[in-house]
Design a protein with these regions (language model features):
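Secreted, disulfide-rich extracellular signaling modules
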Residues: 2-15, 19-493
Length: 493
């Protein structure tokens, strides 16, 4: 009779456990793998076992910091870190995790077409500028006053199919040598902030150029021509800004640059205005930072971290740092955690085969990683979802075994990477079935290493989340549960 064995095993990073429940692998589909048995009189048997590692061996963890993070895999964005609808700016620091500096680079387009009569009756050039921001505090000390400079872009920020965010991107190579505007800011933002900018000599030249431009350049069908002349801005912390200031996030759909000037109204305008009969008024032209109306705006988040002077200083040089007991996953382009499976893990799995001509098929492999602190505060600070990635540089997310079922039926997906917030629980459960199957067939270090990184919503691509994870050396290290099928080739006895 053709024979197939189905097994269930569990591996802890440091010790072997025997507290396994069969229901945990059979409540969704207790015939998992049966389609691989080519006959009508076949026997399917279930075994529950514990997978032991070699003495002193464990699923190890290390901290890494990647220069490039592609977001398409985790957010389904078509443009990755470009056009995120949010921007970061400011500086903050942490004694353990170092310094972070953020700048916002974006194109700006007229929020509405400027008609030929727009400047009629004016008797001044643009004489003042306001920046309207929709900010909230991310981290740091908001009482520390910061100075920001607003530079004109020297090069065009064109649309691109590149979905990678590069921490090494140097906006300094693409901006004018002198800032056009500057402003100071401190405090906790209250929704919309309107900030009057200091107009610098380069800013005066920009305003004159805007006023002298042919108004037809501002029509929607000429926006590409407009962007060739007025390429956009970079909002950058001044070098005088203290490192221990604050980091802010800004929502670009509510961000505008208003250029003000004085004009005299016609008689008919005064007549229809019941509230204001003054002839001289202040008017403005508004530039928008978003692509709300698909006007081809482009934005880039520039986020830089510096771990100098911290236990993680080696990350600056691209090195890995072994984690003992606790590992971390940071938001806002910070560090990730790499789990490396030892060879003995796969050797023990291979040893389950009755003979060498059997094949192991991974039906389901679940990764469990616990957080050390089970409090509402820790849960709120942590990522509400972690992703398991086979290549974090490109973020090739590992497919969920049940993802097709979850999209077509009411079956609850056993892996979604979400944090279990129940009291005393506090763990992430992730499906690593495809990773483990690939690792069985490939014994190189890259194939047997898995990166845990954050996942994000479309409006929080670099959120200020921070997750602590218990790893090898802790009281409850990483655990893997595997459901597998043993298949004998050719249906032989």
């Amino acid at each position: 009779m053709r024979n197939s064995l189905k097994g269930f095993l569990c591996s802890m990073a440091a010790v072997c456990l025997t507290i396994l429940a069969a229901v945990s692998c059979t409540h969704v589909d207790d015939t998992l793998g049966q389609d691989f048995i080519p006959g009508g009189n076949d026997k399917l048997s279930l075994h529950i076992d514990t997978l032991g590692l070699g003495e002193g061996e464990a699923i190890t963890a290390s901290q890494v910091f990647y220069d490039s993070i592609g977001l398409a895999g985790s957010t389904r964005h078509t443009r990755g870190a470009m056009n995120l609808h949010i921007a970061y700016m400011g500086r903050s620091s942490d004694p353990t995790f170092g310094k972070i500096t953020a700048a916002s680079i974006a194109t700006c387009l007229p929020s509405e077409p400027v008609r030929p009569y727009f400047y009629r009756g004016r008797h001044s050039t643009f004489d003042s500028v306001k920046l309207s921001l929709n900010m909230k505090l991310v981290s740091g000390d908001p009482s520390v006053r910061q100075r920001f400079n607003v530079y004109r872009l020297r090069d065009t920020l064109a649309y691109t199919t590149d979905t990678i965010y590069y921490q090494s991107f140097r906006y300094e190579d693409h901006i004018e040598s002198e800032p056009a505007f500057s402003f100071e800011y401190s405090g906790t933002p209250a929704d919309i902030e309107e900030i009057k900018l200091d107009v610098l000599p380069a800013g005066e030249a920009f305003l004159k150029e805007m006023m002298a431009a042919d108004t037809t350049l501002f029509y929607s069908d000429r926006y590409y021509e407009y962007l060739r002349q007025f390429k956009g801005f970079a909002i950058v912390p001044d070098t005088s800004t203290p490192e221990n200031a604050a980091l802010y996030v800004n929502y670009l759909p509510n961000t505008y640059l208003n250029l003000y000037y004085q004009r005299d109204r016609d008689d008919w305008e005064i007549k229809v205005d019941d509230e204001n009969k003054e002839r001289e008024i202040t008017a403005y032209m508004q530039l928008a930072f978003t692509d709300n109306d698909t006007r081809d705006n482009t934005s880039i988040a520039s986020i830089r971290r510096d771990y100098s002077g911290t236990p993680y200083a080696a990350l600056n040089e691209g090195q890995r740092i072994e984690a003992e007991g606790v590992a971390y996953v940071q938001g806002i382009g910070g560090m990730a955690t790499v789990l490396t499976f030892p060879d003995s893990f796969f050797e023990s799995l291979e040893a389950r085969k009755p003979s060498s001509d059997y094949t192991i098929y991974i039906n389901q492999a679940q990764l469990f990683v616990w957080v050390p602190e089970h409090t509402a505060t820790a849960y709120d600070r942590a990522f509400q979802m972690l992703g398991s990635y086979s290549n974090y540089g490109k973020m090739s997310i590992i497919a969920d075994y049940y993802i097709s079922d979850s999209e077509t039926t009411s079956v609850e997906v056993p892996y979604d990477g979400k944090l279990n917030r129940n009291p005393g629980k506090g763990y992430y459960r992730m499906d690593i079935s495809s990773f483990l199957q690939h690792a069985l067939l490939n014994d190189d270090d890259e194939s047997r290493s898995l990166t845990l990184g954050g996942t994000y919503t479309p409006y929080e691509p670099f959120s200020d989340y921070f997750t602590s994870l218990m790893v090898a050396g802790s009281e409850r290290p990483v655990q893997v549960r595997v459901v597998y099928t043993l298949i004998k080739p050719n249906g032989e006895q």
